[in-house]
Regions:
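Acidic/His- and Gly-rich active-site-bordering loop/insert found
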Residues: 3-112, 131-136
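Acidic/histidine-rich catalytic neighborhood of metal-dependent amide-processing enzymes
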Residues: 115-116, 120-151
Length: 151
């Protein structure tokens, strides 16, 4: 099976996973035990790492500050960096920003573009590489933070 076909076949799963992560309100809030940036960012980080584990990647959560998911065994590592927290929603939303929806073929919700959606796309790309057994000379590490959007 070629890579492009596999990507097309993965579309529904990709959209489902983006919607799952976007549905978590991950605006920074009051810190709590084990959640340095509040409950939402911690939940979003764990959700992302759970998706990575389901894809067969090795994960590690660094006390809800950040985490990573690895694939491959090379001595060198290629890092892909992103985050799962979002800025406060502000005014002007005509629908709940944490209830993602598809309208006219476009996915809407807080974090779809910055940065939950792109990180899930990266995860699915790595998952497809793994499923296809494509050999890598370097390890791929998806590094995800829970506190990029704060002051």
């Amino acid at each position: 099976m070629d890579f492009e076909k596999k990507i097309k076949d993965d579309r529904e799963s990709l959209i489902r996973d983006i919607m799952k992560l976007v549905s978590i309100d991950s605006v920074e809030s009051k810190p709590a035990e084990g959640m340095p940036f509040g409950e939402g960012p911690a939940k979003a980080l764990q959700c992302y790492l759970d998706l990575a584990e389901e894809a067969g990647l090795q994960t590690e959560n660094f006390d809800n500050y950040a985490g990573h998911a690895d694939y491959g065994n090379g001595e060198e590592t290629v890092g892909i960096l992103g985050h799962v927290d979002v800025v406060p929603c502000g005014e002007g939303w005509i629908c709940d920003p944490f209830r993602p929806r598809i309208i006219d073929g476009k996915l809407y919700g807080r974090g779809v573009l910055d940065n939950k959606g792109p990180m899930v796309v990266c995860l699915h790309a790595v998952k497809i590489l793994k499923e296809m057994g494509i050999p890598l000379s370097k390890k791929i590490r998806l590094i995800v933070g829970a506190n990029e959007e704060t002051d």
